[in-house]
Amino acid sequence: MHVTLVEINVHEDKVDEFIEVFRQNHLGSVQEEGNLRFDVLQDPEVNSRFYIYEAYKDEDTVAFHKTTPHYKTCVAKLESLMTGPRKKRLFNGLMP
């Protein structure tokens, strides 16, 4: 299992817009073959900080995810909402 944890920080006045932009990515991602989990989390202490927990069957399904229209649209729209680049950490999923 291929797991990615992504931290995304957005401008405080863009939180609602971020949630709507990412909702579309979430809805598309959970329908993908090979997607095991796609959670969007909001930091309770920093309202404008989000974490995305993505679990995919393998690297091929991750590669496919990055070709989908919902992913590409989301990434393009995120640029103006973020305070800096996304931070990604990769993990090997052992016990889902």
UniProtKB/Swiss-Prot annotation:
One of its GO terms (molecular function) is oxidoreductase activity. Residues 2-91 form the ABM domain. One of its GO terms (cellular component) is cytosol. Involved in the degradation of phospho-AI-2, thereby terminating induction of the lsr operon and closing the AI-2 signaling cycle. Catalyzes the conversion of (4S)-4-hydroxy-5-phosphonooxypentane-2,3-dione (P-DPD) to 3-hydroxy-5-phosphonooxypentane-2,4-dione (P-HPD). The keyword Kinase does not apply. Homodimer. It is an enzyme of class 5 (isomerase). It catalyses: (2S)-2-hydroxy-3,4-dioxopentyl phosphate = 3-hydroxy-2,4-dioxopentyl phosphate. It comes from the Bacteria. The gene is lsrG. This is (4S)-4-hydroxy-5-phosphonooxypentane-2,3-dione isomerase.
